C-alpha cells in the first residue's frame, strides 16, 4: 500500500504476472494506475513476458517469488535478469512472503540478490510461516531514499507494541521455523500424492499450499 501511494500517480502503469497476488492490483488501481498483466508459462511468472509488457509509462513491477496463489517460483538467474533488463527508473518489488519454505539450489531470497541495488524493494512478512497474520506485521528492505519516501507517508503508530514484541521473539525461534518447514514438506507431498491418486491435477510446490485444477474431476466434493 505504501509503495503504491509513494510512487504511483494517475495513468502510470504497473506490471504484474497473470496470476499474481491480488493485493498488487488493488492498491495500484486505488492510486489510479493501470495494471498490465504478463502471461505466465504453466502458472510460472515469465521474465520475457513481463519485459514485453513494459512501456514508457511503467513505474513498478511486482513479483512474488514464490508466487501466491500458484506456488511456483523463478530461479535466481531469471530474477536477476529481470532487474538488469528493466529501466533503472522502474521500481522492482520482490515479495518474499514464502521464502522461508524454499530450500532449492536455484532459488535465492531477494534480500541476498538485491542488497546492493537502489531500485528494488524486498518485502517480508510474519503472516506465513510464523503464523502471525492477525498482527499484520512485516518488514522490507530498500535503499535509504526509498525508505525515506515511505516513511514520509506512512501513518503514525501503524504497528502496535505487542506486534513488534511478538515479531522480535518469533524471528529468533529457529527451532519453530525448522519444525514448520519439515511439517510442510511432509504434508505437501502427502496431499500432492493423494490428489494424483484421485486424478486431480495440481502443480508441485515448494511452499505451504497447492493450486488445484478441478476442471477434469468427475467426482463429487464429498468423494474428494
Indicate residue ranges for each PLM-predicted region:
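Phosphate-binding glycine-rich loop
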Residues: 1-13
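Short beta->alpha connector loops at strand-helix junctions that form conserved
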Residues: 18, 37-42
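Active-site pre-lysine segment of PLP-dependent enzymes
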Residues: 29, 47-56, 69-92, 98-127
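A short helix-loop-beta submotif of the ANL/AMP-binding
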Residues: 30-35
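Short beta-strands and strand-loop turn motifs
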Residues: 37-38, 60-66, 92-96, 204-206
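PLP-dependent aminotransferase class I/II
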Residues: 119-196, 200-203
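Conserved PLP-binding catalytic core of the aspartate aminotransferase-like
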Residues: 195-224
Amino acid at each position: 500500500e505504501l509503495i503504491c501511494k509513494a510512487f504511483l500517480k494517475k495513468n502510470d502503469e504497473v506490471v504484474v504476472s497473470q496470476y499474481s497476488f491480488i493485493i498488487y492490483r488493488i492498491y495500484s488501481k486505488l492510486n489510479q494506475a493501470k495494471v498490465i498483466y504478463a502471461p505466465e508459462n504453466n502458472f510460472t511468472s515469465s521474465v520475457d513476458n513481463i519485459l514485453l509488457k513494459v512501456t514508457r509509462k511503467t513505474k513498478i513491477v511486482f513479483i512474488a517469488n514464490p508466487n501466491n496463489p500458484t506456488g511456483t517460483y523463478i530461479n535466481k538467474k531469471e530474477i536477476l535478469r529481470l532487474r538488469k533488463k528493466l529501466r533503472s527508473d522502474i521500481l522492482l518489488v520482490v515479495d518474499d512472503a514464502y521464502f522461508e519454505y524454499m530450500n532449492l539450489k536455484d532459488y535465492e531470497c531477494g534480500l541476498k540478490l538485491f542488497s546492493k541495488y537502489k531500485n528494488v524493494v524486498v518485502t517480508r512478512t510474519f503472516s506465513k510461516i510464523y503464523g502471525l497474520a492477525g498482527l499484520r506485521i512485516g518488514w522490507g528492505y530498500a535503499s535509504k531514499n526509498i525508505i525515506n519516501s515511505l516513511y514520509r507517508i506512512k501513518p503514525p503508530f501503524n504497528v502496535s507494541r505487542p506486534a513488534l514484541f511478538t515479531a522480535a521473539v518469533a524471528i529468533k525461534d529457529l527451532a519453530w521455523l525448522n519444525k514448520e518447514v519439515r511439517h510442510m514438506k511432509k504434508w505437501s507431498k502427502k496431499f500432492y500424492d493423494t490428489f494424483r491418486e484421485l486424478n486431480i491435477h495440481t502443480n508441485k510446490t515448494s511452499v505451504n499450499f497447492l493450486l488445484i485444477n478441478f476442471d477434469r474431476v468427475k467426482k463429487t466434493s464429498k468423494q474428494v
